[in-house]
């Protein structure tokens, strides 16, 4: 007779795992910050990956990496399809959770000590995050005011006018974030010709997408082509505070077509919204600053520990938290804890 398996009481992803996932990104950020400014992006990424993978092992869940460091044969850990979470006792099954990770967004930024490097994850119930291939994705990202106003097939000038109208501004008032890449030369020229201003960034279109959808960040939209995995993570964040996004995979080779089909995507030319990319009913998004940025402070070390700054958001419960944490590596002694 086969053993009867006991399934742990169903969990609320948002209620029961938010604190655990905040801890995961904090551990990755602390580890990668130790490599900041050392000029070795690979070492920075490896530090974040190892710390994140180890932190997952303490969580009572059957986690499934749906977006990670690459295919199984190309990544030693946090690869697509890897199972993460604590090993359950015999006869017990932990609840299943889909997880998307970018252990260190902006590896070059961390290696150079420049702003906006972050450690990121998103999680949902199974099926709540698109299994996106590791390819490029065309994106336009803006705030909640631009709901249903963006058209990825329309000219750049049309979308700029639409964004300006939604924000009650002139096009010349807008600041658009674009990745500084040769492939964006024509896009940059069109934005300038329309009269909008541009903020070029070296890396980090995920953090840029979040900033563009938040009021008071000084930017109004993101245009251009970046990574598809980062697009799904951005969509998870946007779902939590109703940001707007339209996107489409860039599938321009036979190899990519086959990879997209293997991942269950039947229409490679489909235009996605944030809801399409992150359709879950329960979504967690967590990001911890590595270097200082527009939204998050980087990790700050002191003699007996460090301080982290984390953005933690949930979709169903509609919560956006900025978590300021002091980590004490040992007894603080006579120093105590500094508030600011």
Q: What is each PLM-predicted segment?
A:
Residues 83-87, 115-129, 216-218, 239-243:
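A glycine- and small-aliphatic-rich helix-loop capping segment at beta-alpha/alpha-beta transitions
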Residues 120-201, 263-266, 293-300, 304-339:
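Acidic beta-strand-loop-alpha-helix segment within the catalytic core
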Residues 94-105, 109-130:
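DPxDG-like acidic metal-binding loop motif
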Residues 86-90, 107-112, 163-168, 188, ...:
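A generic local secondary-structure boundary/capping motif
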Residues 8, 191, 202, 211-216, ...:
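Helical "lid/coupling" subdomains associated with nucleotide-phosphate turnover
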Residues 65-69, 99-101, 110-112, 131-132, ...:
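General beta-strand structural signal in soluble alpha/beta enzymes
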């Amino acid at each position: 007779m086969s053993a009867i398996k006991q399934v742990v009481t169903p969990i609320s992803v948002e209620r029961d795992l938010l604190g655990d996932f905040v801890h995961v990104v904090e551990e990755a950020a602390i580890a990668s910050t130790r490599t900041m400014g050392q000029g070795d992006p690979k070492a920075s990424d490896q530090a974040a990956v190892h710390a994140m993978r180890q932190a997952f092992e303490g969580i009572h869940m059957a986690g499934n990496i749906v977006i990670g460091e690459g295919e199984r044969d190309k990544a030693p850990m946090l690869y697509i399809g890897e199972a993460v979470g604590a090993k359950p006792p015999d006869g017990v099954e932990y609840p299943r959770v889909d997880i998307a990770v970018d252990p260190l967004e902006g590896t070059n930024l961390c290696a150079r000590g420049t702003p906006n490097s972050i450690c990121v994850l998103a999680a949902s119930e199974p099926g709540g995050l698109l299994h996106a291939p590791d390819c490029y994705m065309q994106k336009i990202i803006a705030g909640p005011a631009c709901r249903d106003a963006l058209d990825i097939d329309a000219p750049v000038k049309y979308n700029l006018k639409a964004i300006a109208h939604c924000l009650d501004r002139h096009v010349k008032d807008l600041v658009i974030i674009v990745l500084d890449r040769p492939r964006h030369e024509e896009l940059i020229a069109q934005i300038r010709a329309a009269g909008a201003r541009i903020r070029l960034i070296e890396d980090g279109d995920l953090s840029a997408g979040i900033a563009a959808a938040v009021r008071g960040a000084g930017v109004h939209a993101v245009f251009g082509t970046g990574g598809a995995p980062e697009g799904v993570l951005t969509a998870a964040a946007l779902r939590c505070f109703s940001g707007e996004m339209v996107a489409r995979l860039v599938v321009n080779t036979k190899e990519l077509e086959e990879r997209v089909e293997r991942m269950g995507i039947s229409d490679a030319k489909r235009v996605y919204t944030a809801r399409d990319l992150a359709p879950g009913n329960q979504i967690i998004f967590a990001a911890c600053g590595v270097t200082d940025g527009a939204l998050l402070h980087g990790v700050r070390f002191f003699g007996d520990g460090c301080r982290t700054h984390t953005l933690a958001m949930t979709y169903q419960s509609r919560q956006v938290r900025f978590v300021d944490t002091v980590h004490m590596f040992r007894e603080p002694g006579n120093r105590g804890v500094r508030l600011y």
